[in-house]
Amino acid sequence: MCCLFGIYDYGHSLTAAQKKRLVSSLAIASEDRGTDATGIAYNHNGHLTVYKRPYPAHLMRFKLPDDAACIMGHTRMTTQGDGKHNYNNHPFEGTAVIPFALAHNGVLYNDLTLRKDKNLPPTRIETDSYVAVQLLACLLYTSPSPRD
């Protein structure tokens, strides 16, 4: 299964280097739960940034801005959707009134039924988890907007 991790710099007391070190350490510690891909999401200057790669966490290189107070991350063990295709990796981007990022740990066994029953739009994203992004977007009358 996968792993979720993150930090919240509530007092804005950490430097970008300290946050990077913390997030990197958490990601590497999370490799026991998945090495097929690693990704992070954070807000920078009012814009959602998602960075993900089909690498284990110990090979992932990233930068964090000083103003990123909340950073979420995900290490993936592939269960559905080839992890070599980065669009299948977490976190996923969507829009439901405002842009959001979603990462999921687990397996949705009814994703194909949900796609059909809720008449969700076709997507090249093959994971079961992405149906949650689509459902959130449809619930609030917007559509997901994945970026690779």
Task: Describe the function of each predicted region.
Residues 1-143, 147:
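Conserved short alpha-helical segments that host acidic/polar catalytic motifs at enzyme active sites
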